[in-house]
Amino acid sequence: MNLAFICKRLILFVSIFFLSVVNIYAIQDRKIEEGKAAAMANTSVTLIDIWSIYHNQAGLGYLEHISFGAFHQSGFIKEQNLQGISFALPTKTGTIGASYSYYGFSQYNEMQAGLAFGRSFTKYFSVGLQLNYLYTHIAGNYGTAQSVDFEIGILSHPINNLMIGAHVYNPSRSKMGGEEIPTIFNLGISYLFSEKVLLGIGTEKDLNRDAIFKAGIDYELIDYVSLQAGISTNPSKYSFGIGFHYLKINAHVGFLNHQTLGFTPSFTLSYDL
């Protein structure tokens, strides 16, 4: 057994250990926080855009245009980078969506492919559902694991300017290679105080972890520029970001601050036909 082989094994072990301990962005932990969501501390269960496919598929039911999106989240190390693409197609019966996300590097990675459907029954209520295929690969003799799970969400618009959203990821308690995939509940409300100011608050509960409380704000600075900020608990984090909107193009940059690990940036770009 030569020194090069030992070094490669050591690097692989350290990388996998680090990813498992500081796995904040793992797909299967549902920490997909694209630019705007990251900037608002992930108070995203009531937001309506192409990114509803990751946060609450009920939001897809209100989309009026074909949309494409791509995002990239930079991890604390490059092996923790997460990226993905999404697509939404409104039809007469509802909106069909598809998404793909990839996390990790050649020695350890996770993939998720999702197919979603969202429908608004009235302007006051919508429902969304998504089926996911999950895949995890660990190099060497560790092998791979695969699974299927689903998620469901609802949105209510009871009065002008007020939105209430609820979402459950993996209510079936599916497992991956004998390990439980997290089951996560999200509940949130948002209120549009004016054409320029949106305030959202929410709570997130993983069945195996303490509840998270979060709040975020979106402020339209000028016609083409918006600012976002947010805070959340367990652990304490704060976030901020900026959005650019021109014609049918939307771009966001969000920064999420972890009290121990520092800032992580997220970038998104979407286009509406």
At which residue positions do the language-model features occur?
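Subset of outer-membrane beta-barrel
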Residues: 27-273
